[in-house]
Amino acid sequence: MNDGVSTPVWLHIGPLEIHETVVTTWLIMLVLVVASILLTRRLSLQPGRLQAMLEGVVLTLESAIANADSRNARRLLPLIGTFWIFLPVANLLGVIPGMHSPTRDLSVTAALALVVFFAVHAYGVRQSGLGYFKHYLSPSPILLPFHIISEFTRTVALAIRLFGNIMSLEMAALLILLVAGFLAPVPILMLHIIEALVQAYIFGMLALIYVAGAMQQTTESPITSSSRSTSGAP
């Protein structure tokens, strides 16, 4: 774990500084990509133990997504599944001595939140076409500024929530180690693992809720719908 808030600079390329956060983030992605290729290159119709375990992981992720949106579980699996695989690894990197989680850097969590922000609208447009944006004018166009503010504030909250929790977790662990010395490593390690997994799950679940909500938006306003039901129109 690192005892500082800022991440150290590992490399200078002219005026450009490459921070440890960038290196560790790309390293995690490289490891996950290579592991995915190696683990899936020999898939069989008669799975062995390893393939059965991997299929169980995928089915578990798909089932969790289906609980929120059963109709679009397959379509959402690549995005949400990636979050639920990348984030636990990133959050748990701080357990390794001399390393710290890239998610304790606000720039990383902000980038992840922006991915969610753009994914919400991409999936919404893919589902409903450009008519998806009409829901920002519902129930009245005067509420458009409030809808826009809501979109940005929840994106900021998504970034700050993950950053704040991982940062506070590592700082609290450091303070406990300074006070209790070597009497506390095992409880701290367990706390770190549990909290890292919980925060990864929460981030992925919030992303799932936002994207699924966008895909379920209809182009018909509530006012039109209620007037039709009142008048008895089909």
UniProtKB/Swiss-Prot annotation:
Q: Which GO terms describe its biological process?
A: proton motive force-driven plasma membrane ATP synthesis
Q: What gene is it encoded by? A: atpB1
Q: Cite the PANTHER family for this sequence.
A: ATP SYNTHASE SUBUNIT A, CHLOROPLASTIC
Q: Kindly state which keywords UniProt assigns to this record, in alphabetical order.
A: ATP synthesis, Cell inner membrane, Cell membrane, CF(0), Hydrogen ion transport, Ion transport, Membrane, Transmembrane, Transmembrane helix, Transport
The transmembrane segments are 20-40, 76-96, 105-125, 162-184, 195-215
Task: Describe the subunit structure.
Answer: F-type ATPases have 2 components, CF(1) - the catalytic core - and CF(0) - the membrane proton channel. CF(1) has five subunits: alpha(3), beta(3), gamma(1), delta(1), epsilon(1). CF(0) has three main subunits: a(1), b(2) and c(9-12). The alpha and beta chains form an alternating ring which encloses part of the gamma chain. CF(1) is attached to CF(0) by a central stalk formed by the gamma and epsilon chains, while a peripheral stalk is formed by the delta and b chains.
According to its UniProt record, which protein family does this protein belong to?
Answer: Belongs to the ATPase A chain family.
Keyword Methyltransferase set for record: no
Task: List locations, semicolon-separated.
Answer: Cell inner membrane
HAMAP family, per database record:
ATP_synth_a_bact (MF_01393)
User: What disulfide bonds does the UniProt entry report for this chain?
Assistant: none
Transmembrane recorded as keyword = yes
* Cross-referenced NCBIfam families: ATP_synt_6_or_A, PRK13420.1
Q: What are the GO cellular component annotations?
A: plasma membrane; proton-transporting ATP synthase complex
GO MF terms held by the record: proton-transporting ATP synthase activity, rotational mechanism
| Gene3D superfamilies (UniProt xref) | ATP synthase, F0 complex, subunit A (1.20.120.220)
Purpose: Key component of the proton channel; it plays a direct role in the translocation of protons across the membrane.
InterPro entries listed in its UniProt record = ATP_syn_F0_a_bact/chloroplast, ATP_synth_F0_asu, ATP_synth_F0_asu_AS, F0_ATP_A_sf
Q: How does it sit in the membrane?
A: Multi-pass membrane protein
- Chief location of this protein? membrane
| Designated name of the protein | ATP synthase subunit a 1
